[in-house]
Amino acid sequence: MSVIAADRKPASDRKPVSDRKLARAAASSDRRFAAISHALLILWSVIVIVPMLWVLMSSFKSTGEILSSPFSLPDHWRFENYANAWTDANIGKYFLNSVIVVVSALILVMLLGAMCAYVLARFEFPGRRLIYYVMLAGLTFPVFLAIVPLFFQLQNFGLLNTRPGLILTYVAFALPFTMFFLYSFFRSLPHDVYEAALIDGAGDWRAFFQVMLPMARPGMAAVAIFNFLGLWNQFLLPVALNTDQDKWVLTQGMAAYASSQVYDIDYGALFAAIVVTVVPVLLVYCVFQRRIAGSVSQGTFR
């Protein structure tokens, strides 16, 4: 009797049958949800990857091969398509213009956005919330509504059809998002570190650049990548504000190259130009994708 009593579990440790059934049903539901989610992700990956692989494969074909056997491997790998796109279509010049404009705008917007977000997040002064909401409203302002005022404004300042004018326009439209993204990072930083820097003799500028800004490096990296992707693919602003062909960016050059070859299209060179346009974006995202995901989740929880 004592052995039976010892092996018998207390009533409080035994789960009712209904609870076990609910647990099994929940586990089964989770498995079904995971299976459906993975299937949808695989389908989405196929939809995205297959066209990209087709474009890459077609960039090494001749026009005849692309039209006769679009889904086969190239009979002869035509690397000269990239040379034709780079020189004959001036993709090389447009690529350099895009690098100059985007990198310059990115440096300015990251510096100004970080300073603005830091001041609004760490200092108390009259009108702070008003400035924050005005900057936030810039996220909802459609770009096309500002095209005409921007055109005349840049024309009055002598910045129309110039790289500095396009850079300043890029900065103006990327600044609200940068400030909004970095605001939560600076608010979450410990105030004791800032006070310790002041006690050690650092001024506000030195404390910002040498102490607080390095601590917000994950957020800075993520927002820099998002800004790079948006500015690199920008089309409407340069088309309206940068009509000088020598200063065209890559999106303008690609549109002009695709539309100029109406009847006699060199599809191989066209696909090569597309690859040249897309590769920088893919490289940036593939290299920094973990930092993007980590920074976004970190900023969300903060």
Curated annotation (Swiss-Prot):
- Localization: Cell membrane
Q: Name one GO cellular component term.
A: plasma membrane
Task: State the CDD domains in the record.
Answer: TM_PBP2
Question: Which N-terminal residues, if any, form the signal peptide?
Answer: none
Q: Which family does it belong to?
A: Belongs to the binding-protein-dependent transport system permease family.
Subunit arrangement? Answer: The complex is composed of two ATP-binding proteins (MsiK), two transmembrane proteins (NgcF and NgcG) and a solute-binding protein (NgcE).
Entry protein name:
Diacetylchitobiose uptake system permease protein NgcG
The organism's taxonomy opens as:
Bacteria, Bacillati, Actinomycetota, Actinomycetes, Kitasatosporales
